[in-house]
Amino acid sequence: MKKLVLTLAAVILSAGLMSAQDMAKATETAQSANDALVAKDYAKALAGFKEALTLAEACGDEGAELVGTCKSVIPNIVLSMAKNDIKEAKYDEGVAQLEEAIKIAEQYGAADVIDDAKTLIPQVKKSKATALFTAKDYAAAADAFKAIIAEDPADGASALRLAMALTNTGDKEGAIAAFEQAAANGQEANAVKQLANIYLKDAQALLKENKLKEAIAACEKSNEYVESANAYKLAASAATKLKDNAKAIGFYEKYLGVSPDAKDAGAIAFTLGALYQQASNKAKAIEFYTKASADAQYGAQAKQQLEALKK
C-alpha cells in the first residue's frame, strides 16, 4: 500500500512538472506572438496566439487567464488584417477577413469586434464598387452596386451610382429602374434630372428618325421629371412636322414660359404669330407679332404682319 501511495505521488509530481512546463511554453508562445503583433506581422501574431490558446487550454485552471487574453486578442488581429487589406484596396479579401473576424468574435464573445466589422463590411463593398466605377469598369461596378442594393434596397446613393453605371453600359431600361429607385430613396433631385435627360435624348433621336409622335411622347415624359425649354421646343418641332398646329402652339408657348429670355425668343414669338394667324386667331397673332417686333432678325417681318392685321 505504501508503495502504491509513493507511486501515485510520483505521478502527481510528474504531472505538475509537465503542467508547469506546458504553461511556460504557452506563455512564451504568447509573448512571441505579442512581439509579432507589435511589429504588425499579423499573420505570425495570429498563428502564435492560436497556438498559445491551444497550449493554455490544455493547462486547465492555470491557463485560464492566458486563454482569456488569447480569445480577446485573436478577433482583433483578424480585424486588423482585414483593415490592412482594405487599405491596400484588396476589397474582396478585406470583406472575407471581416466575415472571419465576426465568426471568431461571436465564438469568443468579442462584441466590439462584431460591431466594428459589421459596420465596415457595407463600407468596403461601396469602396470596391466606387473604385470600379472610377476605373470605368462600368459592368463590374454595376454588379457591385446591385449586390449592395440587394442587401439594402433603401440605399438611394448606391442606386444612383448603379443607374449611372448602367447608363454607361447602354442598359437604358436598367438605368431608368435604378434612377427610379434612387429617387424613391432620398436622391430625387439628382435622379429626376438624369431621367429627364434620358427621355430628352430619346426625343432627339426619334425626331432625327422622323418618328414624330414618339418624339413628342418622349418630350412629355422628360417634362414629367424636369420641365425644360429644350423638351418643349423639340415637341413643338415634331408637332409642326405633323402639321398639328394646335399642339405646336401649346408647346411653343410653354417654351417661352420656361425660357422667356431665350436667344431665339423673338423667332419663336414670330412663329407663334404665324401659327395663330393661320388659325384665324387675330388677337393672339397680334400679341405674338408684337413680341417679335423688336427682334433683330424677325422684327421687320413682324411689323409688316402687324400692319396687315390692323387694316
What residue spans do the PLM features occupy?
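Short coil turns that delineate tetratricopeptide repeat
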Residues: E57, E106, P153, G186-Q187, ...
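Terminal, low-structured helical/coil segments at or just beyond the last alpha-helical repeat
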Residues: K201-K213, A217, K263-G266, F270-K311
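TPR alpha-solenoid repeat register
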Residues: E62, A110-A111, A117, S158, ...
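Residue-level recognition of tetratricopeptide repeat
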Residues: N34, N76, K83, T130, ...
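Canonical tetratricopeptide repeat
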Residues: E65-T69, V73, S80, V113, ...
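N-terminal leader/linker segments that initiate helical-solenoid repeat arrays
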Residues: K2, L6, L13, L17-K83, ...
